[in-house]
Amino acid sequence: MNNFASNDPLVIAGIVYSSRLLTGTGKFKDLDETRLATEAAGSQIVTVAIRRVNIGQDPHQPNLLNVLSPDRYTILPNTAGCYTAEDAVRTCRLARELLDGHRLTKLEVLGDKKTLYPDVVQTLKAAEQLVAEDFQVMVYTSDDPILAKRLEEIGCVAVMPLAAPIGSGLGVQNRYNLLEIIENAQVPIIVDAGVGTASDAAIAMELGCDAVLMNTAIAGARDPVLMASAMRKAVEAGREAFLAGRIPRKRYAAASSPVEGLVG
């Protein structure tokens, strides 16, 4: 952990993290590549699709936890592939059982298979139920500022608006909505979905997002481990740029050297 990270931590549900890059564990060619990419990213939180990745459900298959130990990483189970609140809640309960009472969970309830946009009605319903059951909910949602605030108000510990559709690689498509969400939030805002390359991650962080979560942008790259390293640097650079404060955009030039005392 570098000195800057230690002085500017990310806090989720009372836990302090030095890394602001959260990574997924799907789509890699094997568990060894998953491990190497996660290490290169410097992630401390890794998200796992309970319905797709084995963390103990099948004793006859390779177990992700053998390469990404819960002693080293915060395992963030997610409800990817769920299309109803009931399925999502059931999946979270299974994850809590598999992870010995682990309360932190990433909720996503999808609306359709083409866009993978969240079903906001089902998302709200599931979030309310999970909070009532004492889960610590990090929630994937649209970039609607009203909905984001509502999810915060019902007790979600982090709100995760999409930058663009899952896996699209389009980057931040509506920075003004994201800015509105960020400015009104009292919980961490984490861009989730749509990042394609390092500049996308930097832009999200420059806007003031607290962190970025990605999977496809790393796992789908020609060299996933190298891309993970690039994303780590982009997130760090974007955060520093946000804190430093960019100069205002101007229509005309402004000389960087003084005009007083010119020779001749």
Curated annotation (Swiss-Prot):
Binding site for 1-deoxy-D-xylulose 5-phosphate: G167, A193, G194, N215, T216
Catalytic residues (positions): K106
Gene3D superfamilies recorded: Aldolase class I (3.20.20.70)
Top EC category: transferase
A GO CC term assigned to this protein in UniProt: cytoplasm
Recorded catalytic activity of this chain's protein: [ThiS sulfur-carrier protein]-C-terminal-Gly-aminoethanethioate + 2-iminoacetate + 1-deoxy-D-xylulose 5-phosphate = [ThiS sulfur-carrier protein]-C-terminal Gly-Gly + 2-[(2R,5Z)-2-carboxy-4-methylthiazol-5(2H)-ylidene]ethyl phosphate + 2 H2O + H(+)
EC number(s) stated in the UniProt entry for this protein: 2.8.1.10
Main localization, broad class: cytoplasm
Stored Pfam families: ThiG
Matching SUPFAM superfamilies: ThiG-like
Subcellular location: Cytoplasm
InterPro entries to which the protein is assigned, alphabetical: Aldolase_TIM, Thiazole_synthase_ThiG, ThiG
Keywords: Cytoplasm, Schiff base, Thiamine biosynthesis, Transferase
Residues spanning the signal sequence: none
Entry GO MF terms: thiazole synthase activity
Pathway: Cofactor biosynthesis; thiamine diphosphate biosynthesis
One GO biological process term: thiamine diphosphate biosynthetic process
Subunit architecture: Homotetramer. Forms heterodimers with either ThiH or ThiS.
Record-stated family: Belongs to the ThiG family.
Function noted in UniProt: Catalyzes the rearrangement of 1-deoxy-D-xylulose 5-phosphate (DXP) to produce the thiazole phosphate moiety of thiamine. Sulfur is provided by the thiocarboxylate moiety of the carrier protein ThiS. In vitro, sulfur can be provided by H(2)S.
Protein name: Thiazole synthase
Source organism: Xylella fastidiosa (strain 9a5c)
Gene giving rise to this polypeptide: thiG
